[in-house]
Amino acid sequence: MAQIAPLRVQLIAKTEFLAPPDVSWTTDADGGSALVEFAGRACYQSWSKPNPRTATNAAYIKHIIDVGHVAVLEHASVSFYISGISRSCTHELIRHRHFSYSQLSQRYVPEKDAQVVVPPDMEDDDELQQILIAAVEASRATYTELLVKLNAKLMAGELGGNRAVLRRKQARQAAHAVLPNANETRIVVTGNYRAWRHFIAMRASEHADVEIRRLAIVCLRRLVDVAPAVFADFEITALADGTEVATSPLATEA
């Protein structure tokens, strides 16, 4: 029976800042937050922090977001390894063109034992889940049958070697046409701070699909841990149905 995969978002990389020794400047932050401040101050050579209202890293970053100088947010980045996400959801995710992606390949990795991601609206309904699982298992049986027949067809006359490997890939590529969007996939996503803010603003909205909204909320919580000054203006609240959204008065980029 197909197993259900829970959403998991793991931080796997973040920006490290190395202060140049010939610049007389210090900050109370590190990593990407320090880099963002450094980039902003480099524009005006304001190393002495002449404005006391922006002397701290948090105050400086809030100011640059307030005034729309968000290009400096592009210097720092975060990478996540995301699992327990459906193919359907990643079709939406990859529309965010400022991210970089590396996703599990259905051509190279057999899908007959892949886990399933249950749509949020079915999570509290056993009957709907049983219908979903039955449909998934039926599609996998068809996938397996097609794979066997395609392998036999494409491998006819092949004696092994690189062409045999290619034929197996071609068989998987053709057979996966019947696999459901509920199949779990896994993906590495890298984005700069500006791109992550845009993603959160768009996908943590009440108007977004619930699965990708849930992903955006989990990513936001991880991002706040990495760079609180950059992401803490987003407020997470619960809707009447128990799902969560995140909003910020400073998230103005559409």
Swiss-Prot record:
Active site residues per record: R203 (involved in ionization of n3 of dump, leading to its activation)
Residues spanned by motif ThyX motif: 95-105
Pfam families reported in the protein's UniProt record: Thy1
Protein name per UniProt: Flavin-dependent thymidylate synthase
Quaternary state and interactors: Homotetramer.
Known EC number: 2.1.1.148
Function in brief: Catalyzes the reductive methylation of 2'-deoxyuridine-5'-monophosphate (dUMP) to 2'-deoxythymidine-5'-monophosphate (dTMP) while utilizing 5,10-methylenetetrahydrofolate (mTHF) as the methyl donor, and NADPH and FADH(2) as the reductant.
